[in-house]
A protein has these predicted regions:
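Non-catalytic, surface beta->alpha helical segment in thiol-disulfide oxidoreductase systems
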Residues: 54-75
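Generic recognition of short, well-ordered alpha-helical segments
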Residues: 16-19, 41-42, 63
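Small/polar loops that bind or transfer phosphate-bearing groups
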Residues: 6, 31, 60
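Local sequence-structure signature of Cys/Sec-based thiol-disulfide redox active-site neighborhoods
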Residues: 1-24
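Thiol-based oxidoreductase modules, predominantly thioredoxin-like and allied folds used
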Residues: 26-37, 44
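Structural micro-motif
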Residues: 44-51
Length: 75
């Protein structure tokens, strides 16, 4: 899957970000950073983070629908 959302359990901002992406129709895989020590070290206080695996880019929270659209449109 192209887009990944780095999250952690019981994170209300992560839930908000996922809900926004779902409302926009963005197919995204949620990845719990607490299951991977390397991801936890990289994203510990940054979650939620939207990651584009094809372009190796990140969109840090806070973001809104317009930010996501711009992020997805950038080449």
């Amino acid at each position: 899957m192209r887009y990944r959302l780095f999250v952690r359990l019981n994170c209300h901002l992560c839930a908000d970000a996922f809900a926004l992406l779902c409302e926009m129709g963005v197919e995204v895989q949620r990845i719990n950073i607490d299951r991977d020590p390397a991801l936890r070290a990289q994203y510990d206080v940054l979650v939620p983070v939207l990651f584009d695996a094809e372009r190796d880019r990140e969109l840090l929270y806070p973001f809104d629908a317009e930010d996501v659209r711009r992020f997805m449109a950038q080449g």
